[in-house]
Amino acid sequence: MSDDFSVFWRNNERASALFYDLLARAKRGAYDDDFLAQLAAYREAEPTSERADIFAAKYLLHHGDAENAAVCAERAYRKRPVNYEVWLLLADLYARLNRPIDALIMQGYAYGLYGAPQFSFHLDEDQLREGLGRLSIALGMGKGAPLAKVRAVIREQGLQFSTDLFIGEPLPLTMPPHYSRFWAASYTDYYLSDQGIMLDHNRHTDAFSTYGYRAASFQLQQAEEVRGPSEIQIPAETTAIVPIAGTSHLQKLTITNAGASHPLYLGKWAFSLFRLEGSAHITPADDRPYAIGTPIPLGHSPARRKLVLNILVDGLSWGVIRACFAECMPNTARFFARGTIFDQHFSVSEFTYPSLPTIETGRYPAHTQVFNENDSHELPLDIKTLSESMADLGYYTAAPLGAADCIYSGAMRGYRTLNAAPWTLPSADMAERTIRQIEAFNETDQFLYLHTADVHPWNPKGFKFYPATETHLPLTQRVFEVDENVTSVHLAQLPVYQDHFWRSLSCVDRHLGYLFSYIEAHFDERDILVSLYSDHGNSVFTMPVKGSVDVIAENATHAVWMMRGAGVPEGHIVSELTSTADLYPTLGTLCTFPVADDIDGNLPAVFGGKERDAVYSMSMFPGQTYKLAVRTHDHALRLETQEKVDEDGTVDFADARVGIYPRTHELDENYVVDSAELRAFFCPRARDFVREIANNGEFWPSMRAARPEWFGGQP
């Protein structure tokens, strides 16, 4: 690459030549000493490439060393977990190593995304439930838990698939040590069994899988499923709250606690809460299973706050509301006037699925590898999530209302209770549920996560706009043709979307005001830490560029972040650049949990850290060009690749279009700024940011051939 940065990216031609030479040798099965020599040269040329590990695994497998081949393949999987070649390799290796469930998971990933190869497996009777459950998740999308795009079952005809969900059972996910799996139940405030009975009736219908799921609400509780008598272990002289759910209507148990026995009547797939003094014994009336949630011990600690509250307002753009914040969100503005507001805060991603794991881990999507919503791989357990870290401190971690987007990926695995909605996240429910949650568990320290999508734009076909929007807009602005396949980030700048946004924003603020008033009336300032933030901005206030929506424009990525409570400076509007990755280390500092050295998040200077010199927003969506914005206070480098992003998140940066602009005129070619000083600042940072997803023009033929609409059918 040239020293003057006049060319942004040059591929390593020697490494590319070595890759294609190794590819040709592998195709011939020529795994000899010359192959090893070429592999050594390739690894020297590309020391961090997962492709070298794939070739090493193929070599070892050819020579009968499946165990060490798996070590290499798993190293490749750690870096590139959404990769067809890696999946095929691991499926073969795990089968050879007598790891049939792991092999089946890899087959599921491959078939779910590419439709091949056909399944080949053998599971023992005691492996069927786990294996088929894992396969069902692997075949489906990464969002929507506990829904299953397809559910794998064994019938007389063999392996069959049906529309379904996980309900009244544990989610087959990998949990941290000493954590129980999420047991999937319905969420209900009234009659215990009604929702469960309706779900049981509708779960396999097209009507539910296509429409009904949008109104469904679930409660995922870390719990153990048991049959027969059981013991609930609680230390002596300790009071704890224990969630218990049944699997049938009015399921009867007898519970013995503190020397007395009591009858319990449970609902079908619904949790009820019980206060216990010390350990308890349960005697069921029959052998039907039931679920016992992880006990929640009561008690406060001076090392913790009584309430740490995170509120995600999905799609709220600070760039849109900053000039009128006090007028359009008066309750929120009043509450956070006693805290700190970040004025230059940007999301890393343009939509929720990759953005939420960034917030929950402090890592960019290149490091979480959660970016492809058609894949459901899990975060490695050594990536500690925000909820896990808070649970380690002794907080009761719960989400009174949360999206179902990132449960399968593991980004939400530290929440003991997670009320998940696949689609509908109204702020009215959010506020009321939160107050009920705080009241119910006011004898313990709580870390709560909330998520509302009221202001998020949706494709208008079949969507119900805010009532006042429908009654006040004339037909010329209210009714129009639209492609039902247009995603929210590509919605145009139209009056109906904008009017819906402003009216919904007032609704959100009204309900937040209700919640904030409750908090101020019941907590001292030293006992709270409240954060309000968004995961991305909003496309419907973004000017089109050459007829297309700029999905990482300022208004689409200029996000919201404000904090109030113990340790937060009061009355500050901070101009330093911040990222959605920065919430994680900030809470680590304020709440005193350890933060790994290798995260991407930065502790803001206002909390004792160091100011960022740039902030990054990008779009890493398979089948679309990769886009990047590197912003300072005054300028922005904008990049777009010529080629589309592959399913594994990699892309070729050769010939990428790059320009530097004033922040106020991004992508306006009349304002391009081309100076050696700016190139020397921006280009090294942009290169470092994209380096881990740059494929150097090296492609696996099987992946290219599977996406002719993206790559023209050329390997």
Where are the regions that the model predicts?
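Canonical positions in the second alpha-helix
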Residues: 41-42, 75-76, 110
